[in-house]
Amino acid sequence: MNWTGLYTLLSGVNRHSTAIGRVWLSVIFIFRIMVLVVAAESVWGDEKSSFICNTLQPGCNSVCYDQFFPISHVRLWSLQLILVSTPALLVAMHVAHQQHIEKKMLRLEGHGDPLHLEEVKRHKVHISGTLWWTYVISVVFRLLFEAVFMYVFYLLYPGYAMVRLVKCDVYPCPNTVDCFVSRPTEKTVFTVFMLAASGICIILNVAEVVYLIIRACARRAQRRSNPPSRKGSGFGHRLSPEYKQNEINKLLSEQDGSLKDILRRSPGTGAGLAEKSDRCSAC
């Protein structure tokens, strides 16, 4: 499995994340993916071939292994990491869409040179507005995926300690046979480590949701106490609702002033326009 591509995609999200989000990404890639790739896959690499039962009945080893280990630990953790990391791509797509809109606005304003467009790509997007909702939803989905996989792991493998010996009486085994698990101590250590890392990620996700909500409430309270001025700088300001509303009001005022000048210069035309408007309103 190629984890480098996933890391490259999520590194772009890391630029626009909170401090807690950056810590979460470090835990994901250093304490989980690196351990999974470097150590855990080698420990579980020979799990099926080294699962030996004290019988020569054909097929008994396979059915006993499937009964006690329906899903490999490594494959379950790999699927968990992929699904947990996927919601962060929503933030990356939202940021890319927002930057595309900024570039489009710059071109319409006559600032479409490569220098300005590159500056839009480099600057950090603030987590506010619709991006705030996208970010919170992605964190909530991460939290749900972590909790669901922890519960699935508990259902599949009660307890965290890897057993050394299991007794199996599933057909086609002739009777109750003893089956031996390879490297039980190593597997127990890595299982505890991965479950602890998953628990840390759950705590980080909860803390990030609380932090985002508190910061959003603080910003709203600050806006009510100190209303923002009409002036602003930066590309992020150009996408704010206040900026858009100011631009619309400016265009409407300019059009209103132009219409008044036309009516003042040619009263006949103004009367005709008024008559047409009355007819339209009557219709």
Swiss-Prot record:
Q: Which GO terms describe its cellular component?
A: connexin complex; endoplasmic reticulum membrane
State how changing I213V affects the protein, per the record.
In CMTX1; localized mainly on the cell membrane forming gap junction-like plaques
Q: Which residues carry this modification: Phosphoserine?
A: S233, S258, S266, S277
Q: Which residues cross the membrane?
A: 23-45, 76-95, 131-153, 192-214
Chain ranges on the Cytoplasmic side, renumbered to this chain: 1-22, 96-130, 215-283
Asked if Cell membrane is a keyword of the record, the answer is yes
Q: What is the effect of changing M34K?
A: In CMTX1; localized to the endoplasmic reticulum
The way this protein sits in the membrane is described as: Multi-pass membrane protein
Please describe, based on the UniProt annotation, the reported consequence of changing F149V: In CMTX1; uncertain significance
Q: What is the effect of changing V95M?
A: In CMTX1; non-functional channel
Q: Cite the effect that the entry attributes to C60F.
A: In CMTX1; moderate
Substitution effect: W133C:
In CMTX1; moderate
* Listed result of changing R215Q: In CMTX1; non-detectable levels of hemichannel activation and non-detectable levels of electrical coupling
Report the subcellular localization.
Answer: Cell membrane; Cell junction, Gap junction
In the record, the effect of F235C is given as: In CMTX1; the mutation causes abnormal hemichannel opening with excessive permeability of the plasma membrane and decreased cell survival
Q: What is the effect of changing A40V?
A: In CMTX1; localized in the Golgi apparatus without reaching the cell membrane
Extracellular topological domain: 46-75, 154-191
Q: What results from changing E186K?
A: In CMTX1; non-functional channel
Impact of mutating M34T? In CMTX1; functional channel; localized in the Golgi apparatus without reaching the cell membrane
Known outcome of mutating R142W: In CMTX1; moderate
Q: Which UniProt keywords apply?
A: Cell junction, Cell membrane, Charcot-Marie-Tooth disease, Dejerine-Sottas syndrome, Disease variant, Gap junction, Membrane, Neurodegeneration, Neuropathy, Phosphoprotein, Transmembrane, Transmembrane helix
What is the recorded function of this protein according to its Swiss-Prot or TrEMBL entry?
A: One gap junction consists of a cluster of closely packed pairs of transmembrane channels, the connexons, through which materials of low MW diffuse from one cell to a neighboring cell.
- State the protein's name: Gap junction beta-1 protein
